[in-house]
Amino acid sequence: VCQIVAKFPPSISRMLGGMMIEMIQNADLSILHAIQGTASPALDTFMVGFTTLGEFGALWALLAVSMIASGKHRSYGFAILAAIALVVVFGEIGLKHLIARPRPFLLDPSLATTLIDLPSSYSCPSGHTASSFAAATVLCLAPLAHRWLKPVAVGTACIIGFSRLYLCVHNPTDVLFGAVLGIACGVAAVAIVRKIAEALQNRKAQA
């Protein structure tokens, strides 16, 4: 689609690009309104709880610290911290300011929630989702003895991402982009940590 749009004169390309962005935004807002139709006091409490767990990647950072402190899968604990750091650098510092997408409640004030403090930063990608999927990806790549922890981590990441939609602080495409970014950061962090561990082992072997 992008190649087709690029073949048009610049003015038409900009117009078509703007139409595509508007279509995506309208679809995002429609999905958010549909999700709002499922709201209930019980879900309010549940979603606020999960979105709080994902704040600043706190849940995953605590898990990483516990892995490092216990000595079990220590390198993967460091990988989780590295993955979250990559999300901060590329997502929060880089892409959010590059894309500069407004929050959905700024485009449609009827979506503004009173359940949490409304964030003032840009919307895309979702940092909660990115850090959660980054950590979950690391755990999926780790040789954990308790394999059930892997689907639990992925499920938790999905719920945290959905909580951002339920609270209408992100668009669906923000959350999708955040998940993709998180997976990429998780894979990259594991690769980096494994390379470092391999280099340290080789150095010890040569000593």
What do these predicted regions represent?
Residues 49-52, 76-85, 176-179:
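Loop-to-helix transition at the N-terminal end of transmembrane alpha-helices
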Residues 38, 42, 69-73, 97-106, ...:
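Membrane-interface elements of multi-pass transporters and channels
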Residues 112-207:
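Membrane-embedded catalytic cores of phosphoryl/pyrophosphoryl-handling enzymes
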Residues 11-58, 92-121, 207:
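N-terminal transmembrane-helix/juxtamembrane module of multi-pass inner/ER membrane proteins
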Residues 63-66, 86, 90-95, 99, ...:
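Alpha-helical membrane-inserting segments
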Residues 63-91, 150:
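Interfacial segments of alpha-helical transmembrane regions
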